[in-house]
Amino acid sequence: MSGTFDRLKSPSSVKQYILLELCRFFKDNPLRRPCRFVWCGAEEIGLEGSRHYARSLSPDSLRQIVLNINIDLAGQLIGVNHAVVSAEESLCHILQFLAAHSGIGLTVRQGIFPSDASSFADVGIPAVTLYRTGVGGHSRKDTACLLHPLALQKTYDLALELTRYLGDSMVFPVSRAIPENVRQPLNDYFARTAGS
């Protein structure tokens, strides 16, 4: 799981609290598979932190990491929950099922999202970004007054259910492939942002 280290009281930053709570939960409730929590910096200047981390993984580590779950914007009271899947389409269906099972409205699409998950997909690790759109995220209006505990809880619940479902699966249900309809936009994205 990954997220960016941002200012601490805004939709851009509360993902850190969600990651900490997930970390605490899985410390007390271990999964069948190991789970790694990663905080990355410099997302806003070209995903520099996550790109460095992903590119510095050893070949053995790359083989062991089967999925990256990235949490981006979260907590806006008025907003929509989204998942962008940089992996095979079956992960879209898993997310739709888990969201429906948990009573969480979720828009799911396969593709790329300009967030840390793209750095992991770029090195061949399937990835998904969970985020919530709403007013003010990543702007000068990005303040704590936009946050609400119920909206934060939805992102936490979805990340928890997805991690538990996949982390405890007898056979991991998502293949290690990055499909071409994801790979090409990913290559285009990194070509456009190179040197920025």
Per-range role (PLM):
Residues 17-20, 24-27, 33-35, 136-196:
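His/Asp/Glu-rich mid-to-C-terminal helical/loop segments that flank catalytic regions of hydrolases
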Residues 30-31, 61, 125, 148:
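Residue-level recognition of short, well-ordered coil/turn positions
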Residues 3-12, 78-86, 105, 144-146:
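Second-shell loop/turn segments in exported
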